[in-house]
């Protein structure tokens, strides 16, 4: 669920929120039309963002299936799901080089993030990385405790 929410926010931020913030007062249709008239391939940019957002969801679904099939522990599954979210910072950053850079070049605005939502994605990835470390320490502590009891 967290992976799907992250992917959805990543796509909405890249495709809707950031373009609207970069060009205040314009609609998405107007932005896309202006970019297309300038020679940018907007459908390709949109497809790229959707594809990169979908990769995490597919990885999470595959992890769930393999986890049930191989009877992986909940903590192991949590670590893998958190790793997918932590790694999401990379495609979230790279998505900015498609549509957002076209907007920056065409409209003469900054190519950086124009909303706080990119930061939310990065901080979520950072928190997921921290949670991986915490779960790893927990698993090691638990394993050591079980070994001393045996």
PLM region spans:
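Cytoplasmic juxtamembrane regions at transmembrane-helix boundaries
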Residues: 60-87, 141-150
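Alpha-helical transmembrane segments of multi-pass integral membrane proteins
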Residues: 89-150
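Hydrophobic alpha-helical membrane-insertion segments
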Residues: 1-16, 75-93
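Hydrophobic alpha-helical transmembrane segments of multipass integral membrane proteins
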Residues: 4-8, 56-61, 82-89, 123-133
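Alpha-helical transmembrane segments of integral membrane proteins
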Residues: 50, 74-78, 116-123
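Hydrophobic alpha-helical transmembrane segments
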Residues: 47-69, 126
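Membrane-interfacial loop-to-transmembrane-helix junctions in polytopic alpha-helical membrane proteins
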Residues: 37-44, 72, 110-120
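Hydrophobic transmembrane helix segments
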Residues: 2-50
């Amino acid at each position: 669920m967290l992976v799907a929410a992250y992917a959805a926010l990543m796509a909405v931020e890249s495709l809707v929120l950031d373009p609207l913030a970069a060009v205040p007062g314009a609609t998405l249709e107007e932005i896309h039309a202006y970019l297309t008239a300038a020679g940018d391939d907007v459908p390709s940019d949109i497809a790229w963002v959707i594809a990169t957002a979908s990769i995490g969801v597919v990885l999470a679904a595959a992890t769930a299936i393999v986890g049930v099939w191989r009877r992986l522990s909940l903590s192991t599954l949590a670590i893998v799901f958190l790793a997918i979210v932590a790694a999401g910072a990379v495609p979230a950053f790279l998505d900015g080089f498609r549509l957002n850079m076209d907007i920056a070049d065409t409209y003469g605005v900054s190519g950086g993030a124009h909303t706080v939502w990119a930061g939310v994605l990065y901080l979520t990835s950072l928190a997921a990385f921290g949670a991986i470390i915490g779960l790893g320490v927990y698993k090691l502590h638990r394993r050591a405790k079980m070994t001393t009891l045996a």
